[in-house]
Amino acid sequence: MAHKYPVNWFEIPATNFNRAVKFYSTIFAKELPTTHMNGAYMAFFSTEPLDVSGVIISGEGAEPSNKGILLYLNGGDNLNEPLSKVEIAGGTVVLTKTKISDEVGFYAIFIDSEGNRLALHSMN
């Protein structure tokens, strides 16, 4: 069965793999399964078939950046929960929770522990 979403995989590069895994495990309050494959370390956000998922990746060619595309991660029921943990986990909040519209919800932008610029989205 094919994926039904426009995005089916993402990779968040890390120079310090353990620090990055701790950062995302902290802000999302969940353990991320890890593996070493094809010369790279990976920590998986989901391992369910056909989920939109991705990894934290550390290895050749994986270079953190705060330029380029902006990936919006699921902030759950209310993005305040993971956003409140960003600075505790070693990141920086760039844009606090901001309303897009009643129909689209809210977003916030942060820099993770590795220097990547990402966003969180939630309806509440």
Predicted regions and their residues:
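Vicinal oxygen chelate
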Residues: 7-15, 61-87, 106-111
